[in-house]
């Protein structure tokens, strides 16, 4: 009988808490965390890590060690675009963070090639790294 070992997701949760704190302390944004942003197309509830100013979805993807989480990034684009289309949000940003050695796909996800392909399908969703997030969303 196969069993699946539980994965330590505490680093992702810690990262969410850190980003929420940074936004609250170093920006004028209205910040809400773990918001139910509507129903997914399969009927399940869709929770988003952070919602800024009531209309911008932020999905945080922190990867500490190599794993399958990064393979779910294209699916995250789809879910976020559906939330925008179905529930009236303006835009969404996926933020990838964590040590470069933990990501096999990070450079590709941040490449113009990938971004171009995804924007043609999911026009209101983008992907950036942590440094770009800090530069765009926090006081300088």
Model-predicted regions and their roles:
Residues 26, 83-89, 120-122:
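A structural motif corresponding to the C-terminal end of an alpha-helix
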Residues 10, 14, 18, 45, ...:
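Short, well-structured alpha-helical interface segments that form or flank functional binding sites
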Residues 44-58:
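Active-site beta-strand-loop-beta-strand hairpin of nuclease catalytic cores
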Residues 1-38:
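Acidic-basic catalytic patches of nuclease active cores, encompassing PD-(D/E)XK
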Residues 62-114:
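Catalytic cores of nucleic-acid endonucleases
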Residues 40-42:
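Non-catalytic substrate-recognition and accessory regions of acyl/acetyltransferase enzymes
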Residues 14, 22-27, 104-106, 113, ...:
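Eukaryote-skewed repeat-based solenoidal scaffolds used as protein-protein interaction platforms
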Residues 112-140:
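Non-catalytic C-terminal interaction segments of nucleic acid-processing enzymes
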């Amino acid at each position: 009988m196969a069993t699946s070992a539980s994965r330590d997701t505490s680093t992702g949760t810690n990262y969410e808490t850190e980003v929420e704190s940074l936004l609250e302390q170093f920006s004028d944004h209205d910040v809400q965390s773990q918001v139910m942003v509507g129903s997914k197309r399969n009927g399940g509830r869709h929770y988003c890590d952070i919602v800024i100013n009531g209309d911008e979805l932020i999905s945080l993807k922190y990867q500490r060690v190599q794993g399958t989480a990064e393979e779910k990034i294209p699916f995250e684009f789809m879910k976020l675009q559906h939330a925008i289309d179905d529930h009236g949000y303006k835009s969404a940003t996926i933020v990838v963070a964590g040590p470069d050695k933990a990501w096999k796909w990070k450079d590709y996800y941040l490449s113009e090639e990938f971004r171009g392909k995804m924007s043609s399908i999911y026009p209101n969703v983008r992907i950036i790294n942590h440094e770009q997030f800090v530069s765009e969303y926090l006081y300088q």
